[in-house]
């Protein structure tokens, strides 16, 4: 675990080099992005880098504020560069995200950015998406019918449970998350669209065709994919 954390940090530190003075930065959510936000904040405090951050979760918002990064929103600014982690990345830079249950706002921010950079360790690089269960955010009233629909499509589906309280995980948007294990996903773009057409689905964790760069920390050093 410590090795992977070091590889995550390696990728995160490299991503900060892509940030220019004056940028509005999309701040992803998760353990790898945590390192990115901390280092970005250090450069703000110690080197005078001037940036603003658009957080994708309360977790990222609080960390940005603690790190000295000015927080803004999509209502006020366009995003120059978004930096986010991923649970899986295929050779075409399609992603599965949502392990942190923040994928809806992550997708909004990441897809609206002029440039979207993904930071991962080497364990997240896969030939084909699907080993990681696909997160699907649903409004609570639609939980059961959406679960049945996903199962009819061949998925094994679980309602994600919370570790901090009894009952299901509740997203920052007040919704539930279904983790749908489909196995190998042959056409990520088609699957992304199909899932989002199910009534009651808010967003799913496939990010097809929006990443511009992947920075991966590996045991042999940094690997850059474009």
From Swiss-Prot:
Chain positions recorded as substrate binding sites: 29-32, 84-87, 97-100, 124
Cell division as UniProt keyword: no
Gene3D superfamilies for the chain: 3.30.70.260, 3.40.50.1360
Pathway this chain belongs to: Carbohydrate degradation; pentose phosphate pathway; D-ribose 5-phosphate from D-ribulose 5-phosphate (non-oxidative stage): step 1/1
One GO molecular-function entry: ribose-5-phosphate isomerase activity
Keywords, alphabetical: Isomerase
Gene Ontology terms describing biological process: D-ribose metabolic process; pentose-phosphate shunt, non-oxidative branch
Record: active site: 106
Keyword check for tRNA processing: no
GO CC field: cytosol
Catalyzed reactions: aldehydo-D-ribose 5-phosphate = D-ribulose 5-phosphate
Family statement drawn from the similarity comment of this UniProt entry: Belongs to the ribose 5-phosphate isomerase family.
HAMAP family: Rib_5P_isom_A
Oligomer status and interactors: Homodimer.
Protein name as it appears in the record: Ribose-5-phosphate isomerase A
Lineage: Archaea, Methanobacteriati, Methanobacteriota, Methanomada group, Methanobacteria
Gene name of the record: rpiA
């Amino acid at each position: 675990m410590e090795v992977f954390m070091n590889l995550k940090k390696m990728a995160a530190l490299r991503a900060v080099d892509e940030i220019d003075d004056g940028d509005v930065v999309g701040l992803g959510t998760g353990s790898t992005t945590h390192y990115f936000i901390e280092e970005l904040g250090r450069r703000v405090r110690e080197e005078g880098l001037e940036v603003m951050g658009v957080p994708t979760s309360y977790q990222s918002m609080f960390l940005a504020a603690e790190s000295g990064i000015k927080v803004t929103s999509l209502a006020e600014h366009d995003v120059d560069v978004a930096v986010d982690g991923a649970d899986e990345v295929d050779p075409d830079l399609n992603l599965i995200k949502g392990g942190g249950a923040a994928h809806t706002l992550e997708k909004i921010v990441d897809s609206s950015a002029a440039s979207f950079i993904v930071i991962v360790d080497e364990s997240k690089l896969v030939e084909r998406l699907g080993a990681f269960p696909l997160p699907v955010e649903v409004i609570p009233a639609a939980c059961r019918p959406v679960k049945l629909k996903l199962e009819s499509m061949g998925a094994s589906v679980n309602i994600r449970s919370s570790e901090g309280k009894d009952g299901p995980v509740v997203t920052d948007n007040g919704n539930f998350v279904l983790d749908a294990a489909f196995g190998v996903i042959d056409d990520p773009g088609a699957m992304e669209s199909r899932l989002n057409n199910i009534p009651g689905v808010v967003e799913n964790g496939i990010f097809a065709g929006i990443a511009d760069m992947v920075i991966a920390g590996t045991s042999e050093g940094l690997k850059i994919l474009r």
